[in-house]
């Protein structure tokens, strides 16, 4: 049952993100069928990734029973599905907030949240880029 709930939440947030994106585009007079098609395909991929993570959790749990390590397998599987779920959940909520801010620039509370999240994201990307550059320079 928890998988159905997780998938329902992901589907609900994906639909909300898609709809807020359409509303934002309509308000900004920037409706594009290509963007809608690509956005819809991204949402389908998110659902497939979440479904795969749920299947992975089930598979790892069953494999743990076979190898006499059910608790360890259950923790590993739950972590995998939970991590994917948390990532998709946060990504969708951030996207919905971004759509809201772009459609309604007067929403200062949401704009502040989005601004902080963008700074955090840029710092993380910069750190990842630096780590990648360090690894490449160490290999040469």
Which role fits each region the language model picked out?
Residues 4-7, 44-45, 77-88, 94, ...:
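Alpha-helical transmembrane segments of integral membrane proteins
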Residues 8-26:
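N-terminal signal-anchor/start-transfer transmembrane helix
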Residues 20-24, 50, 98-102:
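Alpha-helical transmembrane segments and their lipid-water interface positions
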Residues 25-33, 58, 62, 66, ...:
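Transmembrane helix-loop junctions in multipass membrane proteins, especially transporters and channels
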Residues 32-46:
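Juxtamembrane helix-capping/reentrant segments at transmembrane boundaries
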Residues 42-61:
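A generic, lipid-embedded transmembrane alpha helix
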Residues 55-91:
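Mid-chain, well-packed structural core segment of small domains
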Residues 90-140:
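Membrane-proximal cytosolic segments adjacent to transmembrane helices
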């Amino acid at each position: 049952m928890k998988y159905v709930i997780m998938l329902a939440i992901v589907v609900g947030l994906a639909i909300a993100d898609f709809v807020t994106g359409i509303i934002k585009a309509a308000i900004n007079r920037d409706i594009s069928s290509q963007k809608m098609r690509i956005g819809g395909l991204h949402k389908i991929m998110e659902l497939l990734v979440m479904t795969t993570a749920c299947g992975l959790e089930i598979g790892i749990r069953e494999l743990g029973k076979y190898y006499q390590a059910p608790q360890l397998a259950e923790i590993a599987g739950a972590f995998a599905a939970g991590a994917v779920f948390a990532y998709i959940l946060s990504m969708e909520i951030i996207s919905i907030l971004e759509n809201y801010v772009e459609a309604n620039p007067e929403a200062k509370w949401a704009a502040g949240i989005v601004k902080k999240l963008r700074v955090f994201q840029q710092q993380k990307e910069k750190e990842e880029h630096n780590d990648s550059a360090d690894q490449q320079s160490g290999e040469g």
